[in-house]
């Protein structure tokens, strides 16, 4: 069942003793109890032991508070995620994706703020763009074109986010009686009519589920494709060599007897 939007009331603070950092920290504590959706300014005031006007002095509305929470959450997330390195791009990108997923899966509040709410302040958006730039630059150094490096990192990001958000929505649906919560719950799997699906699902595979098996398979597909692009690029002659070869061919043709 969903947690009821109540909070333990602390001893009331003295007037003027609260600051923005305390409010943000308290909001994270309260969100762990009641969820981001049920977080409210009056409830936060009770949790912190202050009048709600003390909160409104710093954050005029809930969205302002959530933006500040997102900034803090994103900075922690960025520092917790390993970098993509050019000299070992495949394994470092794999580890980057795995830890990204693990971080969000282990922290529903982080998932709700960054992935589901997806409203980044200019500061948070700038920080996120800088981290993506670094990852893409290292993929270019590893041998991908800028376009392929961008598409590869974007595909990994979408793959991670899709897996995490689907898992988070599944968790939320578990608290309400909303019928089938996964695709396989709604699909009638009958060995007589769907023998292949029945065979594979009996071995533990799940249809469209954001589980480890499906995540790793999709990640392997993205990395394998990037590897083929790098291999293809390494075999292509460099532009400078192509230009030299073209000039040599022109000279040879001009010097040939007619």
Short names for language-model regions:
Residues 1-18, 194-204, 234-258:
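N-terminal intrinsically disordered/low-complexity leader segments
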Residues 22, 64, 95, 130, ...:
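Amphipathic alpha-helical interaction segments
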Residues 22, 26-64, 68:
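Helix-turn-helix
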Residues 72-78:
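Short, basic, alpha-helical segments at the C-terminal edge of helix-turn-helix-like DNA-binding modules
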Residues 80-116, 120-130, 146, 153-156:
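Hydrophobic alpha-helical connector segments
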Residues 131-153, 157, 163-181, 204-208, ...:
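Hydrophobic alpha-helical bundle segments that form small-molecule/ligand-binding pockets
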Residues 181-208:
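C-terminal lobe substrate-recognition/regulatory segment of protein kinase catalytic domains
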Residues 212-233:
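A hydrophobic membrane-anchoring alpha-helix module
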């Amino acid at each position: 069942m969903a947690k009821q939007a109540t909070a333990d009331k602390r001893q009331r603070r003295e007037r003027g003793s609260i600051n923005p950092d305390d409010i943000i920290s308290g909001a994270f504590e309260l969100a762990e109890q009641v969820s981001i959706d049920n977080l409210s300014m009056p409830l936060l005031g009770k949790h912190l032991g202050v009048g709600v006007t003390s909160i409104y002095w710093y954050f005029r509305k809930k969205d302002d508070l959530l933006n500040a929470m997102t900034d803090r959450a994103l900075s922690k997330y960025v520092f917790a995620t390993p970098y993509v390195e050019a000299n070992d791009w495949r394994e470092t990108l794999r580890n980057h994706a795995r830890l990204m997923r693990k971080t969000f899966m282990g922290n529903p509040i982080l998932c709700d703020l960054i992935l589901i709410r997806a409203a980044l302040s200019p500061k948070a958006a700038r920080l996120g763009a800088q981290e993506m730039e670094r990852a893409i630059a290292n993929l270019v150094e590893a041998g991908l074109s800028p376009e392929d490096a961008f598409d590869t990192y974007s595909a990994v990001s979408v793959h991670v986010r899709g897996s995490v958000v689907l898992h988070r929505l599944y968790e939320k649906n578990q608290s309400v009686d909303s019928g089938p919560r996964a695709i396989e719950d709604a699909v009638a799997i009958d060995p007589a009519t769907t023998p292949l699906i029945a065979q594979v699902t009996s071995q533990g595979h799940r249809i469209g589920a954001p589980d480890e098996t499906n995540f790793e398979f999709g990640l392997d597909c993205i990395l394998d494709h990037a590897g083929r692009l790098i291999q293809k690029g390494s075999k292509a002659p460099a532009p400078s060599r192509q230009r030299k070869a073209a000039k040599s061919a022109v000279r040879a043709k001009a010097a040939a007897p007619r």
